[in-house]
Amino acid sequence: MGKKVLAVVKLALPAGKATPAPPVGPALGQYGVNLVMFTKEYNAKTADQIGLIIPAQITIYEDKSYSFILKTPPASVLLKRAAQIEKGSNNGTIVASITQEQLQQIALTKLPDLNTKDVKKAMSIISGTAANMGIQIL
């Protein structure tokens, strides 16, 4: 029989730069997880994606061991990076634009975490996020 799961914690952390300070410390410390070991593992697995926010789903077991799964970065982070902007628009005003090729690349990156396997549908989902952020698709 497998290990008994104590909790599942979801965190969005900067790639390669996680520290035992908040939000990691309070979220995992209450379950007795070795914070230094977790941050070292997380930083090692995300070292090639520095500058992005990488969500992690951490499963904590009763013996205080853990496992974690890395997800793809949020679409908004990928869109801001492609459009080379710091912040999207909050009122629908066009603040930047990206090409269809950039949109397709973002959709391919996000495909494992989306509820579709079709690239065209994934592009549609991402373009909706882009429109809400004030990013125009050329």
UniProtKB/Swiss-Prot annotation:
Its main location: plastid. It is found in: Plastid, Chloroplast. Keywords: Chloroplast, Plastid, Ribonucleoprotein, Ribosomal protein, RNA-binding, rRNA-binding. Signal peptide: none annotated. InterPro entries: Ribosomal_uL11 (IPR000911), Ribosomal_uL11_bac-typ (IPR006519), Ribosomal_uL11_C (IPR020783), Ribosomal_uL11_C_sf (IPR036769), Ribosomal_uL11_N (IPR020784), Ribosomal_uL11_N_sf (IPR036796). GO terms for cellular component: chloroplast; cytosolic large ribosomal subunit. The keyword Ion transport does not apply. GO terms for molecular function: large ribosomal subunit rRNA binding; structural constituent of ribosome. GO terms for biological process: translation. Belongs to the universal ribosomal protein uL11 family. Part of the ribosomal stalk of the 50S ribosomal subunit. Interacts with L10 and the large rRNA to form the base of the stalk. L10 forms an elongated spine to which L12 dimers bind in a sequential fashion forming a multimeric L10(L12)X complex. NCBIfam families: L11_bact. Forms part of the ribosomal stalk which helps the ribosome interact with GTP-bound translation factors. This is Large ribosomal subunit protein uL11c. It comes from Cyanidioschyzon merolae (strain NIES-3377 / 10D). The lineage of its organism: Eukaryota, Rhodophyta, Bangiophyceae, Cyanidiales, Cyanidiaceae.
